[in-house]
């Protein structure tokens, strides 16, 4: 299997994301007003967000999340299976994507469909990605974390540059149909984030229903739910030692980066993210 599928200069996982599907998403897929789109750069808390949104839709009833796999509940639009599922689906759709803005369906930008964009400290994204991609057959294997830091800073990782992904999608942050969430805030005040999502979606949940959403979307419960923990992922795609839900914490990068790596990262971050208001990002 090749290291990546390259499309428009961006590396994508080598399995399940053909160029034809990427072209179709960009040029043919029609976003409907009632769709809800969950956007993230990989390893930013995507599955946690999906779980919370699914539980909000069922008012905390866990039957759906315990009986249907996460990739069937909210298909990844850029995968061949997800795309086929979404174009056949009637009614409102829950859509997941890691796509950069310029490769997403053009129809989104003239639509009132709601978008939730979740971002996470890129240092933690990097460490999580290093462990995740390294234990799959979906991407090129780095020989060390140091190598992966270099690749990440150059955008030579699945879905390309974190910096470009964030800069582009954040251009929508003032729109009424766009909700920006931070992984760090979700960890610190999960209930507050759940309520924020409810408000954005116009969903009114009772206190006991909100408690159920919180309970069934917890890290421990998700880790034990085979519909959400990727235990059902195709075995040829994973290597020994693979674990999808590793630790779900914030600040883990401090246990991995050397001082030199942290300084190199900070330098690139300052350059690439220049122009955003102070306090825009809630991490150190």
Swiss-Prot record:
Cite a single GO BP annotation.
steroid metabolic process
Q: List, from the UniProt record, the residues annotated as the active site of this protein.
A: 98
Per its record, what are the GO molecular function terms? alcohol sulfotransferase activity; bile-salt sulfotransferase activity
Q: What Gene Ontology cellular component terms go with this record?
A: cytoplasm; cytosol
Q: Where in the cell is it found?
A: Cytoplasm, Cytosol
What top-level class of enzyme does the UniProt entry assign? transferase
Reported induction = The ST activities display gender- and age-dependent alterations and are known to be under the regulation of gonadal, adrenal and growth hormones.
Does the record carry Transcription as a key word?
no
UniProt superkingdom: Eukaryota
Q: What is its EC number?
A: 2.8.2.2, 2.8.2.14
Looking up Pfam families in the UniProt record yields: Sulfotransfer_1 (PF00685)
The record's tissue-specificity note reads: Liver, exhibiting a sex-dependent spatial localization in the lobule of the liver.
pH-dependent activity: Optimum pH is 6.5.
Q: Which residues bind 3'-phosphoadenylyl sulfate?
A: 43-48, 120, 128, 183, 217-222, 246-248
Reactions catalysed? an alcohol + 3'-phosphoadenylyl sulfate = an alkyl sulfate + adenosine 3',5'-bisphosphate + H(+); glycolithocholate + 3'-phosphoadenylyl sulfate = sulfoglycolithocholate + adenosine 3',5'-bisphosphate + H(+); taurolithocholate + 3'-phosphoadenylyl sulfate = taurolithocholate 3-sulfate + adenosine 3',5'-bisphosphate + H(+); 3beta-hydroxyandrost-5-en-17-one + 3'-phosphoadenylyl sulfate = dehydroepiandrosterone 3-sulfate + adenosine 3',5'-bisphosphate + H(+)
* Sorted UniProt keywords: Cytoplasm, Lipid metabolism, Steroid metabolism, Transferase
Record text on subunit structure and interactions: Oligomer.
Known function: Sulfotransferase that utilizes 3'-phospho-5'-adenylyl sulfate (PAPS) as sulfonate donor to catalyze the sulfonation of the hydroxyl group of hydroxysteroids and bile acids. Prefered substrates are dehydroepiandrosterone (DHEA, also known as 3beta-hydroxyandrost-5-en-17-one) and 3beta-hydroxy-5-cholenoate, but can also catalyze deoxycholate and its conjugates, and lithocholate conjugates, in vitro.
Which family does the UniProt entry place this protein in? Belongs to the sulfotransferase 1 family.
Give the protein name, as stated in the record.
Sulfotransferase 2A6
The species this protein was found in: Rattus norvegicus
Q: What would be the name of the gene that encodes this protein? A: Sult2a6
